[in-house]
Swiss-Prot record:
Assembly description: The cytochrome bc1 complex contains 11 subunits: 3 respiratory subunits (MT-CYB, CYC1 and UQCRFS1), 2 core proteins (UQCRC1 and UQCRC2) and 6 low-molecular weight proteins (UQCRH/QCR6, UQCRB/QCR7, UQCRQ/QCR8, UQCR10/QCR9, UQCR11/QCR10 and a cleavage product of UQCRFS1). This cytochrome bc1 complex then forms a dimer.
Name of this chain's protein: Cytochrome b
Protein purpose: Component of the ubiquinol-cytochrome c reductase complex (complex III or cytochrome b-c1 complex) that is part of the mitochondrial respiratory chain. The b-c1 complex mediates electron transfer from ubiquinol to cytochrome c. Contributes to the generation of a proton gradient across the mitochondrial membrane that is then used for ATP synthesis.
Cofactor note: Binds 2 heme b groups non-covalently.
Organism from which the protein derives: Pseudochirops cupreus (Coppery ringtail)
Keywords for the protein's UniProt record, in alphabetical order: Electron transport, Heme, Iron, Membrane, Metal-binding, Mitochondrion, Mitochondrion inner membrane, Respiratory chain, Transmembrane, Transmembrane helix, Transport, Ubiquinone
GO biological process, one term: mitochondrial electron transport, ubiquinol to cytochrome c
Binding positions (heme b b562): H83, H182
Family: Belongs to the cytochrome b family.
């Protein structure tokens, strides 16, 4: 009997990607986050689609339309909470996924890694625009401050900002275009994810040992489909607990007031997942310098394959590099805390020290540790 999943043109693609895919037998739970990101994206697209059916992208009624969704639409409050907290879960999985890639040397699959960085930037752009849509106080001032950063670009800055705004300030035109872009970008993310997987399946998955796993591979199904299903249950449990019991924990209280261009928010800060980058931006007194540091903090991921000089791929057997990796994680957590604090001493100084340390760890200390560990391997 002909096995349809191995012969049908469409099912054959799915079979080679998710069923008969040869997978290293020793990949740990850290490899679960790729599938969790896929599920998170599906949750975001579905909840976002239902929200878009009731949301009105107009400055006069946007805030009221969100209130209407929560009060009058059947389970609208749940859809809205799942969408808002789903974004937090998405970014949590994203950061853990990138961290896993750095720890186990997955960045040496250059095409997969570079597409991943492009995906990160696209997801960040989507989330930034989504934050503007409820048209609360923090939405408005966040949009004003972040878009205004582009005015730091020499010669064309001011023109570029006004072009993005569609006027001389953040207004109706800005909200409408942000809604349109926020709606279309997740589908671009889905397309990029397919390209990401395409490149990954060209090489096969990395593994914790960082060695060639071709001698010991098992089919993806049923082993890793079961493992991913367990991860998904954990993700959904946390998301539902957050959305049902404490939906506003990660929100800013300022965003419960309607946007008022005449009243300035005392402390402008983005959602928690952007705080580390915001802290780096604020730590430099110069506007253009801050924007460049902000960009560099993300784009530095692109040069990671070039900075890898170790004879070993993974950090599993490299204690010095492991220590530096965990210092980098701690550094990012401190930057996240600093980003939420007001601009005053001692936070300014801590932010500046941590920003410098962040770049030094990646560009100087990690490559030095690589060389030192190579030297230690010599008999």
């Amino acid at each position: 009997m002909i096995n349809l999943r191995k012969t049908h043109p469409l099912m054959k693609i799915i079979n080679h990607s998710f069923i008969d895919l040869p997978t290293p037998s020793n990949i740990s739970a850290w490899w679960n986050f790729g599938s969790l990101l896929g599920f998170s994206l599906m949750i975001q697209i579905l909840t976002g689609l239902f929200l878009a059916m009731h949301y009105i992208p107009d400055t006069t009624v946007a805030f009221s339309s969100v209130a209407h969704i929560c009060r009058d639409v059947n389970y609208g409050w749940l859809i809205r909470n799942l969408h808002a907290n789903g974004a937090s879960m998405f970014f949590a999985c994203l950061f853990l996924h990138i961290g896993r890639g750095i720890y186990y040397g997955s960045y040496l699959y250059k095409e997969t890694w570079n597409i991943g960085v492009i995906l990160l930037l696209t997801v960040m752009a989507t989330a930034s625009m989504g934050y503007v849509l409820p048209w609360g106080q923090m939405s408005f001032w966040g949009a004003t401050v972040i878009t205004n950063l582009l005015s730091a670009i020499p010669y064309i800055g001011t023109t570029l900002v006004e072009w993005i705004w569609g006027g001389f300030s953040v207004d109706k035109a800005t909200l409408t275009r942000f809604f349109a872009l926020h709606f279309i970008l997740p589908f671009m993310i889905a397309a990029l994810t397919i390209v990401h997987l395409l490149f990954l399946h060209e090489t096969g998955s990395n593994n914790p040992l960082g060695i060639n796993p071709n001698s010991d591979k098992i089919p993806f199904h049923p082993y890793y489909t079961t493992k991913d299903a367990l991860g998904l249950m954990f993700l959904l449990t946390i998301l539902l607990l957050l959305s049902l019991l404490s939906p506003d924990t990660l929100s800013d209280p300022d965003n419960f007031s309607q946007a008022n261009p005449l009243k300035h928010s005392p402390h402008i800060k983005p959602e928690w997942y952007f705080l580390f980058a915001y802290a780096i931006l604020r730590s430099i007194p110069n506007k253009l310098g801050g924007v460049l540091a902000l960009l560099a903090s993300i784009l530095i991921l692109l040069i990671m394959p070039l900075l890898h000089t170790s004879k070993q791929r993974s950090l599993m057997f490299r204690p010095i590099s492991q220590t530096l990796f965990w210092l980098l994680v701690t550094n990012l957590l401190v930057l996240t805390w600093i980003g939420a604090q007001p601009v005053e001493q001692p936070y300014i100084m801590i932010g500046q020290v941590m920003s410098i340390t962040y770049f030094l760890l990646i560009i100087v200390f990690m490559p030095l540790a690589n060389s030192f560990e190579n030297h230690m391997l010599k008999p």
